[in-house]
Amino acid sequence: VDMFLDNPNYEFIKGDIKDLDTCMKACEGVDYVLNQAAWGSVPRSIEMPLFYSLNNIQGTLNMLEAARQKGVKKFVYASSSSVYGDEPNLPKKEGVEGNLLSPYAVSKRCDEEWAKQYTRHYGLDTYGMRYFNVFGRRQDPDGAYASVIPKFIKQLLHGQKCRINGDGKQSRDFTYIENVIEANLKACLAPHEAAGQAFNIAYGGREYLIDIYYGLTKALGVDVEPEFGPDRAGDIKHSNADISKAKELLGYDPEWSFQRGIAAAIDWYKKNL
């Protein structure tokens, strides 16, 4: 946040979304809330279910209530593709969800249901962003729960061996951060008729993990074979998004392909790691 601290239109509030008073302060005099506050990681949620409930569910509920009381016009919040659970069909389409596979997924589904209630009963325009595997500059490459792309880039840059969970043939709809930013801004301008709903936010593509790995080794000029481990609990084999609803109702039109995004991400990490 350092780059914003000198901006007179920016205020940094250090606080916890589990504290309603902090949320009320954050929403004071605000027209638009873009709530990205949550704990990620499916595996960690399996280890810490109560922690995820308190932060991701109660925290979001606090923000919704603060937004309602302070007269916020639009409330845009982070959901997740994990809400599709074990639904096998591709592409993933809103309204066709399966059984949830992790406490993290439960927390995001609960957030969506609470948001719907605030639209239905209190007239707060809410818009859920079902993010699909977001990546890009400044994403943390460290720790046991780091996302795979920044983690692989850092390991390869440092000559370390990368570990792939499963056989590497799983696929995801990796979404560059610029597309996510666009989606949030579009939601702020969306009509009331689109409120109380959730939207797939992705590029609409499908990338295989093993192909990403070897693409990174080629781009970075290294020759390191990966090691393979067991599948992670709570993970699905394949995922990609139908983004037609977001296009129609929000005007979402992602410009950053996976290839363009991965090139930008590599360039940033090479300069900043």
Describe the function of each predicted region.
Residues 141, 147-148:
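Conserved catalytic loops of nucleotide-sugar-dependent glycosyltransferases that act on lipid-linked
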Residues 1-134, 188, 254, 264:
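N-terminal Rossmann-like NAD(P)+-binding domain of SDR-like oxidoreductases, especially those catalyzing
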Residues 115-118, 129, 136, 152, ...:
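Generic structural signal for nonpolar/small residues that stabilize regular secondary structure
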